[in-house]
């Protein structure tokens, strides 16, 4: 970044500081990952200069012959990975992908069944502070009070009672496998559309390690980062019968020109997901998550649902007599990055919370394995149990530094 360093020292310094943070801390935020240098090169390419409103072969600007190739590559690779009939890779985010689906099939005020945010859902699944909860009549389903798993009989009962036009499956903080086939059966029984938001598990689905929602859902949305390990962005997969409507909802419906440099980075990441070693990577994510969950439980920590089937773990910190906010802060102080998170049947404010959400996608990309998961479990428990003991926190910092120093990253940057 020699040009940036010479031209804008302040921005360069901030980027360098962030690189230092990523190198020196243990990244456990479940929605984050580390992309390859190839993905970063594509996103930082000259494609950032190109406007390309429309779709390949049907643009509103000239000079799009090369970006058309890039977008076609991205779409074709997604079809190959997930078996989708139609793909739109233009959404700037998962939220905009969800918005486009809603705009395609819903009218303002229509009833939708979605997962309660504190039970593991997402803001765009009907939260009253989000456009989805403002524009549509969302009815919530959740998890069982004891098992903390989705109660499909309850979902069916609510679907029969409220007759939603759309059912939304998928989550942002649910550590268990979701039965998409069952969701489709419920949707069919009440004559509803089914949309699956697989943002968190897309990489696991791509590797064949989590059930694929594409054969069951009318629409599948996802981000392109998280476990899929691409750039930050979104996409929509749908049945061919909805292709024209979905494309129209994205452009000109809710977006203008697509970000072609990001789509190029998406294409590169999708190519990586098609390689044999990506399945090994995804399996390691799951193995690491299971080992980390076991280690946390051995340390006496409480896990929502008692464990995990994917990359994500939700820790209930109430038995430690602290809040999620305190836990996030003290872990960050020693070099472990997490996020506070609500838990099912939450009683605390979303700005405080009773839980912490962690995930293993990023540390697995860095090369951490089972032994490192044991050390991380020990570190988390040690830090939280000694959150007011500065000597203990200093010891934890040294242990974090010793661990991260064994796994250098982005050494060419």
Curated annotation (Swiss-Prot):
Belongs to the SHMT family. GO terms for cellular component: cytosol. One of its GO terms (molecular function) is pyridoxal phosphate binding. Its EC number is 2.1.2.1. GO terms for biological process: glycine biosynthetic process from serine; tetrahydrofolate interconversion. The lineage of its organism: Bacteria, Bacillati, Bacillota, Bacilli, Bacillales. It comes from Bacillus cereus (strain Q1). Keywords: Amino-acid biosynthesis, Cytoplasm, One-carbon metabolism, Pyridoxal phosphate, Transferase. The keyword Cytoplasm applies. This is Serine hydroxymethyltransferase. It is found in: Cytoplasm.
